């Protein structure tokens, strides 16, 4: 175990597998925001779940302090650390949680996603993934409190496990943003440069997005890592068959300044997800003043309340019609929609999120 200003005792101890610059998705963004506003009674363990890492760059963490790094093989050391509440973010951490570790201490499971198939199969929501189901159920049963990141995810969880209803709390994710947001006005000159940023996963709806612009005079710019090689191959085969090589462009994974430049180059950001438990990508687009064209499934509908350019991802031509509406609307209509996005963003500040979690800690400790 490698410690960076790690104290002898913490009231709250978060275990995570995404932190600093070691990010994959929304759970990592969440963790960095929790770290940004954490108090001195809160510690963090970055759990390395892959191969051993020989070197650790302290600059990967936003500040120096209250961080320990360990490999999953060392997780038994959690039993000897002094903490009151353990907070886990991922069902794979079920392997770390047992009586020896817990010792009658409190456990909170922050459910960033109920790990079902999409669409969810009736009678088999986990699609036969028994290992995933068992780990998820184990943590849910063991936890004193379950936190869902949207009302949609709460309802999804209760639909599968009604017995958990009384111990579920909802805390929407949050992000840190400038109070003054400048509208991206690329759409005044062009409404044909669209972008997608995120993982390559069938649930993200990338293929459906490409299919939707096939008959529209538009480009799609994709910023993504290579998470699923078979899905990428399927996408590439469609692009070739549809003769869209000059209109669909891959930029690789974009972070930092590259991400900023990528988002600023777009006329609108498309979020074609079949389902999103929350939807951090929407908040990021809103931070840059971008018009969004988004599915309305899951937490996205809560983020984009009252917004025009939303669609049902399972409706025929839903995304295509939303794109066409964006292209045909007046500049003043789009400005009005950007105003709605700016107002909605104010509901999701990370500092507010952090304060809501503090209320949960007090509830657990003081009853």
What are these regions (language model features)?
Residues 127-146:
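Membrane-proximal helix-turn-helix segments that form the acceptor-binding/catalytic region
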Residues 308-317, 324-331:
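Conserved acidic donor-binding segment of nucleotide-sugar-dependent glycosyltransferases
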Residues 26-33, 192, 199-215, 233:
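A conserved mid-protein helix/loop that constitutes part of the nucleotide-sugar donor-binding site
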Residues 152, 174:
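Carbohydrate-associated surface elements
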Residues 291-294:
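Short hydrophobic beta-strand element within catalytic cores of glycosyltransferases
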Residues 46-52, 175, 197, 219-236, ...:
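Glycosyltransferase donor-sugar binding loop
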Residues 274:
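Aromatic "clamp/platform" in nucleotide-sugar-dependent glycosyltransferases that forms part
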Residues 88-93, 111:
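Short His-centered aromatic/hydrophobic patch
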């Amino acid at each position: 175990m490698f410690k960076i200003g790690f104290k002898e005792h913490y009231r709250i101890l978060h275990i995570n597998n995404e932190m600093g610059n070691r990010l994959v998705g929304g759970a990592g963004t969440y963790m960095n925001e929790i770290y940004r506003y954490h108090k001195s009674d809160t510690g963090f363990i970055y759990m390395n779940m892959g191969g051993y890492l020989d070197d650790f760059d302290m600059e990967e963490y936003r500040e120096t302090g209250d961080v320990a790094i360990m490999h999953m093989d060392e997780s038994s050391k959690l039993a000897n650390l002094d903490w009151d509440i353990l907070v886990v973010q991922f069902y794979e951490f079920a392997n770390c949680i047992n009586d020896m570790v817990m010792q009658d201490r409190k456990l909170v499971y922050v459910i960033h996603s109920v790990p079902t198939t999409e669409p969810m199969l009736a009678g088999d929501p986990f699609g036969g993934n028994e290992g995933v189901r068992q780990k998820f159920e184990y943590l849910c049963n063991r936890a004193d409190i379950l936190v869902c990141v949207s009302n949609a995810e709460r309802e999804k969880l209760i639909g599968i496990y009604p017995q958990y209803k009384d111990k579920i709390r909802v805390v929407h994710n949050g992000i840190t943003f400038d109070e003054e947001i400048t509208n991206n006005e690329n759409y005044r000159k062009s409404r044909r440069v669209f972008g997608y940023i995120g993982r390559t996963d069938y649930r993200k709806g990338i293929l459906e997005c490409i299919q939707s612009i096939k008959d529209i005079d538009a480009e799609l710019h994709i910023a993504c890592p290579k998470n699923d090689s078979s899905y990428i191959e399927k996408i590439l085969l469609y692009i070739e068959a549809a003769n869209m090589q000059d209109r669909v462009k891959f930029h690789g994974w974009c972070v930092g300044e590259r991400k900023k430049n990528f988002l600023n180059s777009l006329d609108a950001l498309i979020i074609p997800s079949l389902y999103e438990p929350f939807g951090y990508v929407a908040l990021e687009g809103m931070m840059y003043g971008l018009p969004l064209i988004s599915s309305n499934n899951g937490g996205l509908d809560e983020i984009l309340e009252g917004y025009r350019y939303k669609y049902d991802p399972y409706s025929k031509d839903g995304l295509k019609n939303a794109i066409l509406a964006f292209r045909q609307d007046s500049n003043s209509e789009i400005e009005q929609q950007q105003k709605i996005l700016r107002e909605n963003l104010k509901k999701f500040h990370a500092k507010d999120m952090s304060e809501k979690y503090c209320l949960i800690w007090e509830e657990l400790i003081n009853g």
